[in-house]
Amino acid sequence: MCTPEGSANARTEIRTAAGSRRRGGGRLAGMLAAAVLLGSALTGCSSAAASPEADKLARTSAPSPIAPTESRSPEPARVGNATAAPSWLGTRVLPVGPQGTAAARQTPPELRNRSIITADELPPPADGRFHATVQAVPADVLARSSWTKNCPVAASDLRYLTVVFRGFDGRAHTGELLANARVADDLVTVFKRLFAADFPIERMRISSAAALNAPSTGDGNTTEVFACRPVRGKKGWSQHAYGLAVDLNPFQNPYRKGEVVLPELATSYLDRADARPGMAQPREEAVRAFAAIGWGWGGDYRSLKDYMHFSATGG
């Protein structure tokens, strides 16, 4: 260790060495020896106890080719059976055909067994257990939803729910919903059952009007209740516009009527015999949980199939 005392000792040794050489008559040789000793002492000090400024420069300067470099840990590519979302997810807008809709497409390989890590948009439960809240809709939440005064339900008749759900990553996450006040408690019961059954949900978030009307990328997968929009392909209000219907994992549970498939890239999930996580299936937990509160399922429709859709009226 190079201390101030050590430096003084080194200087004393240098003076002593120089003096001894002068007494020997070799003044020049003594000076050279002193210089060598001084350089050695200073080199030892700088390498053993660099100043904070020098240390900072050493850390921030480019490393030598053989030195290890520090780097941040990347986001996990896999958690349990779930993987990170493809970088292109939600970015590739589909072309719209003459009928004003995008054509159904083959499911990309990355989404044929879709199990994506959930990105927390609300704080997850600290204890990993089920929790839920029901309250009047805060003004800021209403403002970022699709609700307007033209919707068929008053804002005072809606409730804001936070609900814990199980992700495809096996973790507990917190989602949010807008729902009609008269079904809010029933929905808490349903999602509590799904959580207890480890039924996975990818995302549960309130959509804005802009999000609902955005050009389709065909790969969305948001579970939600309220959406102020008409019935698909019709002018009348959807049950979602009243807060009386749930779309559950739309990608794993697509809508199909003739050639129309929504989401458009979810065609792999039209094969209901190929059971995969997150799918609503007859006589299984998701369908049973909604049936227990008296709700119907779009998978039972005859003229079309709407596997994601559960509603209080059955329509």
Placement of each model-derived feature along the sequence:
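N-terminal export and membrane-targeting signals
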Residues: 3, 11-35
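N-terminal low-complexity, Pro/Thr-rich disordered segments
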Residues: 28-32, 39-140
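Catalytic cores and adjacent binding grooves of peptidoglycan-active enzymes
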Residues: 86-111, 230-315
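Basic/polar, acidic-poor N-terminal "presequence/leader" segments
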Residues: 113-118, 132-169
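Sec/Tat-exported extracytoplasmic proteins
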Residues: 134, 165-169, 191-198, 230, ...
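N-terminal post-signal-peptidase region of extra-cytosolic proteins
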Residues: 140-149, 172-181, 228-234
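Active-site acidic/histidine clusters and adjacent loop/turn architecture
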Residues: 150-218
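Mid-length scaffold segments of soluble, non-membrane domains
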Residues: 192, 198-202, 216-230, 234-250
